Amino acid sequence: MANNEGEMQCGSMLFKQEELQEMSGVNVGGDYVEVMCGCTSHRYGDAVARLRVFPTGDLEITCECTPGCDEDKLTPAAFEKHSGRETARKWKNNVWVIIGGEKVPLSKTVLLKYYNESSKKCSRSNRSQGAKVCHRDEFVGCNDCGKERRFRLRSRDECRLHHNAMGDPNWKCSDFPYDKITCEEEEERGSRKVYRGCTRSPSCKGCTSCVCFGCELCRFSECTCQTCVDFTSNVKA
């Protein structure tokens, strides 16, 4: 292990040494702790990767499933899909780390400590604002066929998946994170698209209750896009 002190030095001392001492592939960076992780598909086997845990609660995965794989900065949910896991959408249980030679789900480790704290902080922030603002569903168009696919934005993970898709000019149907689809799949009917999850009115076209202009749930401190950089700068100001 890179640090032999009583505490793992990562920003503001993320984890104690004994919490990580039996984990495989531990590496301590300037503002993160990195460990070996993976996800198992019954068809493709184990996809191995490296998980970085940041004090902000952000989780970032660099895939090493094959020597030529260049997938990095994946959310756990995106890595779960990339690995070919058949029962997706349960990344806390499906993505694992090696502890004492055994595969242990992330949900049973200390590695989600700051992620969970961040989620609770966002919930408290929303409650303090009256919990009146939510994130409605958004659509992202395929660069190949032009069909629009629905993204839910109810959690930080879901917001990050949509954020990444919006920032990718070459995004296509096969990149859809929730289901394996192709351009052959029909898009939602127009009559269905009007329902986007507004708590005030089911067919709302956008109001102060469902349109967010930036919060801790949908902006990311490690993202370098101008929108996130501006939000992070304003929060620190």
UniProtKB/Swiss-Prot annotation:
One of its GO terms (cellular component) is cytoplasm. Expressed at low levels in seedlings, roots, shoots, leaves, stems, inflorescences, pollen, flowers and siliques, with highest levels dividing tissues including inflorescence. Keywords: Cytoplasm, Developmental protein, DNA-binding, Metal-binding, Nucleus, Transcription, Transcription regulation, Zinc, Zinc-finger. GO terms for biological process: epigenetic regulation of gene expression; negative regulation of flower development; regulation of flower development; regulation of response to salt stress. Its main location: cytoplasm. PANTHER family: PROTEIN ULTRAPETALA 1. Interacts with HHO5. Associates with ATX1 for trimethylating 'Lys-4' on histone H3 (H3K4me3) at flower MADS box gene loci. Putative transcription factor that acts as a key negative regulator of cell accumulation in shoot and floral meristems. Negatively regulates the size of the WUSCHEL (WUS)-expressing organizing center in inflorescence meristems. May act by down-regulating expression of WUS. Acts as an antirepressor that counteracts EMF1 action through modulation of trimethylated 'Lys-4' on histone H3 (H3K4me3) marks on target gene loci (including genes involved in salt stress response and flower development). This is Protein ULTRAPETALA 1. It comes from Arabidopsis thaliana (Mouse-ear cress). The gene is ULT1.
